[in-house]
């Protein structure tokens, strides 16, 4: 019941995806070949959300792995969990997108997209009651950004009523992988605003900070970063995979988290994060988890929620946690930090509980926040975009693949609209005079 089909596109998406499958295979008691050797009935009860049962007690992920070059795929196949995936579900090209969004979205990616959709269709047909799709990708490159967004819009066309969740690695403020990142990211956000239902924003710099500051790793590897992301991904879907007192699924999450359809970009966090040596010195309690997960240092996207306000939040607790304690803590957070929550959505923290903690922890919590401060992130990318676009730098790579400058202008203005929508709701109060709204009404109709 309630299956999720997982897609991973591009190098970043495949690496995060591989870490994610490693994490949840462990939670469900599967070894690296997908054979069950767990101890608890609960691990099997809702295995079908992410896994198909094959013959011989083997479980196969409902995952579609996509890339425009074979390199990353080979790495996944050679990795510790390479034997887990169904070989037909690897779909790859040979040419690569070369960090060019247009190649991923219009030329190279468009040639491969039908093969991917065939695999997606086959996975969807193997489901009892498909709940939706989740896709891991980055927004700065060519394949994950360009082809990832193409897949999202194609899947949207074919499955209009299913949820579409994306785990998107957004460009970091200081660390840039490629010069054309602002272009790729802006073009991607332009697509995500229209086609995704919930986008969890992650960025490498924030992850580096968490690794250095909290986990005390002197030089974190991508493996460490991916481990953090997979912890969050596992937390977001935990309620689907294990029975709990207060369940939530992708759709419930969206209903509770998205007050206006375009504003579906979330910040995520995870607690407890402690350095490996310090585990034994701490007892984890609900107040401590709450404090850590509402800590700006714990957010996996580089925007500080103290510069904005929360429209909505969701807190997912795992482990032996008392319902009452959670509710008290949430009330506590809201009353102490009321200035960080918009007052026109009362009680805007949704909670979910699940009895089974992640491996190696007694209890944990996952935080998802829809904060207006995420606009900082878009603003930053938008400014970099404008700086390059004004001089038409690097544009020939995109126009050469058949793109039009108009598209860039549209993407830019869509992103600016998004920023100003966040700003508008950040400033909106509950007791504003009626007259103000009457003047503002025409704004709504422009879209």
UniProtKB/Swiss-Prot annotation:
GO cellular component term, pick one: microtubule
Any one GO BP annotation for this protein: microtubule-based process
Binding positions for Mg(2+) per the UniProt entry: 69
Biased composition (Acidic residues): 429-447
Claim: GTP-binding is one of the keywords in the record: yes
Necessary cofactors: Mg(2+)
PROSITE patterns: TUBULIN, TUBULIN_B_AUTOREG
Keywords: Cytoplasm, Cytoskeleton, GTP-binding, Magnesium, Metal-binding, Microtubule, Nucleotide-binding
Residue ranges of the region described as Disordered: 427-447
Function: Tubulin is the major constituent of microtubules, a cylinder consisting of laterally associated linear protofilaments composed of alpha- and beta-tubulin heterodimers. Microtubules grow by the addition of GTP-tubulin dimers to the microtubule end, where a stabilizing cap forms. Below the cap, tubulin dimers are in GDP-bound state, owing to GTPase activity of alpha-tubulin.
Family: Belongs to the tubulin family.
Subunit structure: Dimer of alpha and beta chains. A typical microtubule is a hollow water-filled tube with an outer diameter of 25 nm and an inner diameter of 15 nM. Alpha-beta heterodimers associate head-to-tail to form protofilaments running lengthwise along the microtubule wall with the beta-tubulin subunit facing the microtubule plus end conferring a structural polarity. Microtubules usually have 13 protofilaments but different protofilament numbers can be found in some organisms and specialized cells.
Designated name of the protein: Tubulin beta chain
Organism: Hapsidospora chrysogena (Acremonium chrysogenum)
